[in-house]
Amino acid sequence: MKTEIAFWDTSAALPLCCSQTFTTQSKKWLRKYPKIVVWWGTSVEINRGLARLKRDGHLTEKETIKAARLWEKLKKTCRVVSPVERVLELANGLPENYGLRALDSFQLAAALVWCQEKPRRRPFITADERLAIAAEKAGFNEILLA
C-alpha cells in the first residue's frame, strides 16, 4: 500500500511557500507525499519565518505576501493536529528524552498523536537535523532535507 501522507515540520513546509535552500527538495517530497500533516502551531511558525526572511532582506514585501497567500492555500489541504492535552503531555518529556527545543518537542509530540503513538516508520519530513534524529529514534522514517 502506497503511503501518500507524511508529517511535515515547519522547516520543511516553509520552503514550499518561498524560494529557499530546500525548496526543490521540499517540492520533490510534496509530489511523493501530497497529504500533509502539520502541528497546530505551524502557521505561527510559518508566519514568523516569513517575517524573519523579510526582515533579513531575503524576501521583498511582494514576495512575503505571495508566500503568505501560498501558505494559506496549502494550509487548507493540510491535516492539522490540534493542541490536545496528549500533545502537551508528550511534549513535556521530549526535551529530556531527545534533547529537543520546546517548539520541536511540540512538532514531534503532534506527529506522535497523529499516528496514535505508533509511528511504524511513517514519514516525518524536516530540515532540522536534531529533530530528524529524534523522529527516527521515536520510530518515524525521518526524511532530512539536506
Task: Describe the predicted segments one by one.
Residues 15, 24, 89, 132-133:
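Alpha-helical elements of the RecA-like P-loop NTPase motor core of helicases
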Residues 52-84:
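Helix-adjacent hinge/juxtasegments
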Residues 42-43, 73-98, 105-110:
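Acidic catalytic patch
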